[in-house]
Amino acid sequence: MSVLGVGCDVVHLPRMHRLLTKYDAGSRGFQRVVSKFMHPTERIALGVDGASLSAGQIRYIAGTWALKEAALKALHCAAPLHTVLPPAMFIYTKLLYRQRRSNGVPQLLLDNEALRLDQLQFLRQAKFLSTLSHDNEYLVAYTTLIDTKNLV
């Protein structure tokens, strides 16, 4: 196993709360905001069923944003020289999606459909290790992109 890249991101939760509560959770404005960085799988997992968001839903959205920002930084470390990565919006909404493991730990997965792009072939044998932590006001995400070729 070798480390290909590392990334970190910090989100100020009150700022994310202000951004997300500008719109009713079921509105087109809200959908427009989250569709810029959330994979369809994540939007389904979010489970918006009313006009307002719970504190847990806001943390979920903030955590998703932070994980993807951290992952983008790791990807830029890992991309082979002269490789032009797809735009960030493609990476956020098509390539990466967040799921929880059975123990509740978040994981970032690579969408196999998006991995068909030539410039993403270097990720075919890679995976992200991820962690989130938060307190009342801040949420931090760390990601490590590893090569799984030689994993036992």
Swiss-Prot record:
Keyword hit for Lipid biosynthesis: yes
Gene Ontology cellular component annotations, sorted alphabetically: mitochondrion
EC number: 2.7.8.7
Pfam family, one: ACPS
InterPro entries xrefs: 4-PPantetheinyl_Trfase_dom (IPR008278), 4-PPantetheinyl_Trfase_dom_sf (IPR037143), PPTase_2 (IPR016614)
Record carries keyword Transcription: no
Annotated catalysed reactions: apo-[ACP] + CoA = holo-[ACP] + adenosine 3',5'-bisphosphate + H(+)
Keyword entries, A-Z: Fatty acid biosynthesis, Fatty acid metabolism, Lipid biosynthesis, Lipid metabolism, Mitochondrion, Transferase
Family the UniProt entry places it in: Belongs to the P-Pant transferase superfamily. AcpS family.
Function noted in UniProt: Transfers the 4'-phosphopantetheine moiety from coenzyme A to a Ser of mitochondrial acyl-carrier-protein.
Protein's recorded name: Mitochondrial holo-[acyl-carrier-protein] synthase
Species name: Candida glabrata (strain ATCC 2001 / BCRC 20586 / JCM 3761 / NBRC 0622 / NRRL Y-65 / CBS 138) (Yeast)
Protein encoded by which gene: PPT2
